[in-house]
Amino acid sequence: MQACTLIARAKINLYLEILGSRPDGYSEVAMVLQSIHLADRLQLKSRPHGIHLTCDRPEVPTDARNLAYQAAELLQKECHSAAGVEIHIEKHIPVAAGLAGGSADAAAVLVGLNQLWGLGLTVGELQSLAARLGSDIPFCIQGGTQLATGRGEVLEPLADWEGIPVLLAKPKHLGVSTAWAYQAFRSRREILGATAPSEPALPTLPQALAALSRQDPPALARSLRNDLEQVVLPEYAIVGELRQALLSAGALGSLMSGSGPTVFGIMPSLELAAQARDTLRRQFQDVEFWVTQFAPTGILLQPDPCSLSPS
């Protein structure tokens, strides 16, 4: 194989609870991650040596700051490969949006180069390497619906729930740093401690898992939770405004994804999602909207099916 094309799907967080801090500086979390059909498209082509990365979005770095570039470097080092690769990223997932766009691209490079270079790594081996680059990348490799614990790299697949309509909303000129959001949450928890004002009762992980097991959209909507909203919403008022706007437009439930600023609404139907998108576009002219759906997988290798061995 000399070249391949991959579809790298975005993710949303249906549930994100921060349990505490870890000695390694990360946060201990419990999350439910869900792939959606909004996706980047990557083209990989063999070259004699070196890594050359291009992207159709000028704001995306094309050097070692890019996770996709780092993924190729990591495989070269760990597999003692002198082979090179040309990587082109066609971006559709917004940058710094809480949708794991960079992580999905890195996952696609790991999957694609495993095929292109004939490395024969299992999914489990790829996910172990992926965890060294970022906490969302192991999930992005397989995708679907999964419970993530630890710092997000310990995964437990849940029953796939395909086709649930989702409406995404992201302020065009706003990005939120994941590192800032987690640090702000830790600082808030340390400062407030036991004196923190009582919060309204938050959904729990068992409630979210029960809704998923029953495949009950209204119950899922009631169990949506993202602890990072506690620091992002006070800092960026537009995020809270968009959450409320999605609910007013008919969403069963609405939540910020990851560290934001993207918010999503679980919609009753694709038709209502499209109607809400058109209405909200007139109301929020500096916000991008996408209608999408839950997806059952993460990385899709085209045109041939992925031949990774299960771990």
Curated annotation (Swiss-Prot):
Residues involved in ATP binding: 94-104
Record-level GO BP terms: isopentenyl diphosphate biosynthetic process, methylerythritol 4-phosphate pathway; terpenoid biosynthetic process
InterPro entries: GHMP_kinase_C_dom (IPR013750), GHMP_kinase_C_sf (IPR036554), GHMP_kinase_N_dom (IPR006204), IspE (IPR004424), Ribosomal_Su5_D2-typ_SF (IPR020568), Ribsml_uS5_D2-typ_fold_subgr (IPR014721)
A Pfam family this chain is assigned to: GHMP_kinases_N
Active site per the UniProt annotation: 11, 136
EC number: 2.7.1.148
Pathway: Isoprenoid biosynthesis; isopentenyl diphosphate biosynthesis via DXP pathway; isopentenyl diphosphate from 1-deoxy-D-xylulose 5-phosphate: step 3/6
HAMAP family recorded: IspE (MF_00061)
Function: Catalyzes the phosphorylation of the position 2 hydroxy group of 4-diphosphocytidyl-2C-methyl-D-erythritol.
Protein's UniProt name: 4-diphosphocytidyl-2-C-methyl-D-erythritol kinase
